[in-house]
Amino acid sequence: MIEIEFEKPNYTICECCGNQVTWLTRFVYKDDEAIAFYYATFTEHADEKEVKCLVGICEWENPESEEYTKVTGFPMALWVDENQQANVSLLDKNEVPWENILKGEILDREKALNHPYKEEVFHITDHIFWEDKEIINFLFPKN
């Protein structure tokens, strides 16, 4: 079973519009073992309502160690369509604000689409849409 550890959000101000930008860091566990993390960011812009996200799947050479040895990063966008359906798209690495990750590689879309961790990444995004209240409240506002 997947569980997400929710850190407090950080906030900055958007240089182009002056609106608040939300930055999230989350840690993902499966059966009480750390397996991944994700970063997410979003702001209120008149022309877009999407969350940019980077999911990092961690690998360990030594399972007894607390420190991972490799990360594979999957850049993506999360959004809701006109029918209120949750959507996820894998992106190229230059389409998200994170340029690199410690001990890892951020994949471009084509490489991510064919990567063996792709299904695990989409499983994590299901949980993001179900559990991450910051993202849920942004994408599904209660007006």
Model-derived regions, located:
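Residues immediately within or flanking Cys/His clusters that coordinate Zn2+
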Residues: 11
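Short aromatic-centered micro-motifs
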Residues: 14, 27-28, 128
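Acidic, low-complexity, intrinsically disordered interaction modules
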Residues: 35-124
